Amino acid sequence: MKLIWTYSKKFKKGILNNIASHSYIQKLFQKAIKDAPSQYEKIIYTDEDTVDLFKDIVDEVIIRDKNKFIFLADLKFDVAEKINGEFIISDGDLMINKPLTLPTDVDMAFEYRGQANNIVKGYKNVLLQEGIGTKVPIWNTPNDSYWNLGLMYFNNDILKSKLIKEYRETQSFYMEKIEPKYKYNKNNKQFSACASQMLVEQFNLNNNCKIGEFGELNGDKYIHYGNKRKLDLIKKTSI
């Protein structure tokens, strides 16, 4: 099974990530890769100038395409577009200590499903008010849920390609209509919780996918130091 991480210094965005140094985040990624069970084929998708950080601890390095930052999840969708078949993409602050149990009879799986907060729901309303429904119709479907993308599992190339197509169209709409007017990226406000995490559920509702959750099957097999837990880890560790 291929287990993939995505890293670029250019994607250290957001208030919480900006508190942590580049060096600390790089060490988190290195620890995540080293600690992951050896049964996985370990792959890093990264910039050419950071290959040396990972080349000795992975089985394969894929050089990142030099695309402009739009959403925090861009790197994951970029590498998912390059790889076919069955694979997992993992966050760099997610420590896998045992082989993961995969959901069965699914087309794809993610870490867990949750309910969007008012900020994220507000972002969706902005998309709708600016007319995304005519360009990317899946956004018209009523929905307040999202999928956390800390873990992403794919095994259906056809559905994966359809999901990525919707993601690309959402990116294009955002850069054409949203960023010039609202300047979320310029002001370091992360739209990705809507445009990528909520997008997955919008896609699911329109394509009748079979989506599984890692969280409910793997409670003791990984720890995700996401959000503020990443900052707590800085205080507790000498990584």
List each language-model region with its residue ranges.
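A conserved donor-nucleotide-binding helix/loop in the catalytic core
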Residues: 23-34, 64-90, 97, 199, ...
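Catalytic core and acceptor-binding pocket of nucleotide-sugar-dependent glycosyltransferases
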Residues: 139-236
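Short beta-strand-to-loop element that shapes/binds the nucleotide-sugar donor at the catalytic cleft/hinge
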Residues: 108-141
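GT-A fold catalytic core of metal-dependent nucleotide-sugar glycosyltransferases
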Residues: 77-119
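Short, polar loop motifs at secondary-structure junctions
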Residues: 45-52, 92-99, 217
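N-terminal anchoring/stem segment of glycosyltransferases
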Residues: 1-66, 226-239
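Short His-Asn-centered micro-motif
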Residues: 5-7, 44-48, 90-92, 110-113, ...
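Active-site regions of enzymes building and remodeling cell-envelope glycoconjugates
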Residues: 54-68, 86-88, 103-110, 223
